Amino acid sequence: MVTSVLSSVTISRVSSVLNRDVKQFGKQFLFDGREETCWNSDQGSCQWVLMEFPQNVLVSQIHLQFQGGFSCQTCALEGCYKDGELVKIADFYPEDTNTLQKFTFAEQSVSKLRVSFLNSTDFFGRITLYHLDVLG
């Protein structure tokens, strides 16, 4: 059975926050489990979320919930060990919907994981993400 590898000591970073308003749209809302909060990127191509784990973790699934109209057609998942360079694990292709989407890939051991949103469905390149979880 797979379980979340995210914890209170997981460090996260994002490419941008809409209007730099971290109180309303910051990265902390990706992981809070509340339906009414979200991370909202600013405009621009190739938005991303990076997670750093305190030790190596095994990952095999990612769960995402976008706001329809502000999702992504192609995502790249990359990972590495502590000081290594990120290498591609998988590409996946979310639908432009509000529902929770689950993607499975070959199990990998990583200490850093980056999800890159390569082409947003929004004309300005914004991403709105209500939920992100990584399981292994």
Swiss-Prot record:
Task performed by this protein: May act as a repressor of nr2c2-mediated transactivation by suppressing the binding between nr2c2 and its response element in target genes.
UniProt keyword terms in alphabetical order: Nucleus
GO cellular component term of the entry, any: nucleus
InterPro entries hit by this protein: Galactose-bd-like_sf
Family membership, please give it: Belongs to the NR2C2AP family.
This chain belongs to the protein called Nuclear receptor 2C2-associated protein
Q: Does the keyword Magnesium belong to this entry?
A: no
Write down the superkingdom of origin: Eukaryota
Intracellular or extracellular location(s): Nucleus
> Which gene produces this protein?
nr2c2ap
- Primary location: nucleus
Entry keyword Nucleus: yes
Q: Which organism is it from?
A: Xenopus tropicalis (Western clawed frog)
